[in-house]
Structure formats: structure tokens, C-alpha cells
């Protein structure tokens, strides 16, 4: 419908999506733009929480920057974001709290002054505060 096309056009513009046609399949887009399509579909539902699994895996550096800006905008608007990532830079740059899991259990919780690269690496390797 015309309303659906207008909504899609606005969402594509809001997300700075690069595409040849709104009718093009998402599989024809770059990794970063394909991720934006997925996020855009969820944002149409006005979620209070987004769950993301390695959201920038396989995405080029430029698209990662745009994606990070989008996530920051969403959190500034009140959307909570919970995501899994194996990218330390991503965790340190975007998160205000990181849970390090091992075998399904929380090994460590890092936030505030404890959320540093050295603590993140140590927790990932299984080192306790006393051993650091």
C-alpha cells in the first residue's frame, strides 16, 4: 500500500539506508545495510527493549560507526539494548554494564570504573579480582 511504502521510505531515510530500490531484497544489500533493515523492522514496533546477537559481525568499519550511532540514539530515546558481542571494542564503546558469562553462569559484572579493557580480558580469561 501507499502508506506502507511511505513508512518504508521514511525508515530507510532515518536509518541512512543505501539501496537501489525499496523493492530490492534485503539479501542484495551490504552487511551493514542488511542489519539496518532488520533493526528498522523492529523499530516500527516501537520496542522498549532490543535483543541483539553480535550485531556488527561481518559489517565494515564505516557501517559499524553508523550502527553504533543508531544504537546510541535509541538508548538516548529510552530504548534498552541487551546484546551479545565478542568484540571488546564494541563492548567498551557502547555498554555501561557488561556481564561476562561462562558455561551459562555470570563470571563477572563490569560497570563504572571496573569496565576497562584489562578487567574485561581478565574476566574473560577467568581471572578473579584477587588474582588481578
Predicted regions mapped to residue ranges:
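Glycine-rich phosphate-binding loops of nucleotide-dependent enzymes
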Residues: 1-132
Amino acid at each position: 500500500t501507499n502508506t506502507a511504502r511511505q513508512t518504508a521510505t521514511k525508515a530507510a531515510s532515518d536509518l541512512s539506508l543505501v539501496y537501489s530500490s525499496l523493492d530490492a531484497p534485503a539479501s542484495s544489500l551490504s552487511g551493514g545495510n542488511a542489519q539496518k533493515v532488520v533493526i528498522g523492522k523492529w523499530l516500527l514496533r516501537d520496542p522498549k527493549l532490543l535483543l541483539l546477537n553480535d550485531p556488527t559481525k561481518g559489517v565494515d568499519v564505516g557501517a559499524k560507526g553508523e550502527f553504533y550511532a543508531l544504537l546510541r540514539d535509541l538508548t538516548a530515546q529510552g530504548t534498552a539494548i541487551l546484546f551479545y558481542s565478542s568484540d571488546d571494542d564494541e563492548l567498551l564503546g557502547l555498554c555501561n554494564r557488561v556481564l561476562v558469562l561462562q558455561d551459562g553462569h555470570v563470571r563477572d559484572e563490569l560497570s563504572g570504573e571496573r569496565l576497562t579493557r584489562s578487567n574485561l580480558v581478565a574476566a574473560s580469561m577467568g581471572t578473579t579480582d584477587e588474582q588481578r
